[in-house]
Amino acid sequence: MRYILQIFTGGWDKPNYTAEEILCRLKQLIPKMPVDKVILGWYPDETLYRSVGEYLHENGVDMLLWMPVFAELGDYVPMKPACDLWGKVLGSAAEQEGENFAFCCPTDRGNLQAVTDVYEKAFAKAEFDGIFLDRVRTQSFVGGAEGVLSCGCEKCRQAYRLHGVDLDEVAQACDLDKDRFFAADSDLLKHFLDAKQKIIAESILTLCRSFKARGLQVGLDVFAPLMSSFVGQSLPLLARDADFLKPMLYRCTFAPAGIGYEYEQLRRCAPGAGYPDIVTDEAFLKSELDALRGLPCRMYPGIEVNRRDDIAPTDADYVRRSLAAFAESGVEGATLSWDVMLAPDAHMPFSF
């Protein structure tokens, strides 16, 4: 199995590492395992990326820019924020490692233009081989029901109407009986989520085409299949326009994007909706991997290899067994997430 390495170089205003530190780590890892790509971002420092890219290209490894889309980018350039169905602007639902989870409107043309403008201004000269688009979604249940029920601006309302959904009806149903609205057999919820997934996919298609026209590969960061529809991610639709997807199969992360964590936020928001307890064990992981079969692009699911006692208490056995399940499923590879700079060598494939 082949690997993608992920490194969080820092937010918009503060670097986490120097080029020398990153190169030192990559020179430890790349000779010991088959690496296809390295994803780096999003601190804006073209000199750093050119320096790292020179080493990667000498070793036949592609370098991709890690670029946030509907969250984070608004900290760097002005963007139109998302609002809920009741007209309230959504704030940041959670924050970690300098990351901001305040989301922006997914249909606003100016927001989409900002993504390509920032690439051209801050990164185009760094000789990236591709771009890895993150936050290609709405807010999750971490922001409460209101986060999932977004965006409710007039432009988004028009987009939903084109897909046969009246957002006023959705808001009224949620106000009347939130548990009933969020139940798995709710027809209105299904129609809302189907429309939201199409709306998000239409916007991401615009970005994919724009970056592919620049000769760049495009990868997308996506939620695990269990929770992806709630944040507007149809994996079949997104896979049509991407070169690869990285479903975040994070079973040991107690923070946004962690599968169990996100699922429990759903149950907290709608405790009477009938969602059962789940165990995110290896049988569950196999079912999530099975859900990726047949999608029309390459799959490099993500496994959290870094360890943080507070939010990601991973260990070598968890990583080893997860990667074995990935390999057995037949996916193209795995993304070692979300920052190999923080991962113990014991969590790396060459240690197993």
Segments and roles (model prediction):
Residues Y3-I7, V38-L40, M63-M67, D129-D134, ...:
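Hydrophobic faces of well-ordered beta-strands that scaffold small-molecule active sites
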Residues A242, K246-G260, I278-A291, L295-F352:
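Substrate-binding cleft of secreted/luminal carbohydrate-active enzymes
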